[in-house]
A protein has these predicted regions:
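PLP-dependent amino-acid enzyme catalytic core
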Residues: 1-165
Length: 165
């Protein structure tokens, strides 16, 4: 049976965001306040970091800074790296993630499952060492550092989407 081309099927990118809001039912003390929480774990890569990862890559694409096939580089300790690995895989980018060796094996497995190349620095070097290596790789022409810690497109993912939701 042929697939109906007129039906639009959602992509992974379409599934980032629009996470449910839930009312927190048990608040300390006697209050009539209503507190809501966003279930960001419902994003495809499972965290609040899916939005900024998609934003950082999509905004760089829209500026023409990157095109599919390019190599992206990022220092990470976990969830941002997982989200970037997912987005890079979907959009056709190679991704090098640099992280301290003492991060969880589960996170490393997920990043690799999405196709990211992992480069570990010593635990002593930590995130500073990971960032420095990322910048060194970029200087050698090995790819573009997304630089989540100072990239204005990182919080834009929440400002433009999470907030209005």
């Amino acid at each position: 049976m042929a697939m109906n081309e007129s039906i639009r099927y959602p992509t992974i990118e379409d599934m980032v965001g629009d996470t449910p809001l839930v009312r927190l039912q048990r608040l300390p003390g006697d209050t009539s306040n209503v507190i809501l929480g966003k279930l960001e774990g419902n994003n495809p890569a499972g965290s609040v970091k899916d939005r900024p990862a998609l934003s950082v890559i999509s905004e760089a694409e829209s500026r023409g800074t990157i095109v599919p096939g390019d190599t992206l580089i990022e220092a990470t300790s976990g969830n941002t790296g997982i989200a970037l690995a997912m987005v890079a895989a979907v959009k056709g980018y190679r991704l090098k993630l640099i992280m301290p060796a003492n991060q969880s094996e589960e996170r490393k497995l997920v990043m690799r499952a999405y196709g990211a190349e992992l480069i570990e620095v010593s635990s002593e070097q930590g995130m500073e060492g990971a960032r420095d290596l990322a910048l060194d790789l970029q200087a050698k022409g090995d790819g573009l550092v997304l630089n989540q810690f100072v990239n204005p497109d990182n919080p834009l993912g929440h400002f433009s989407a999470t907030g209005p939701e």
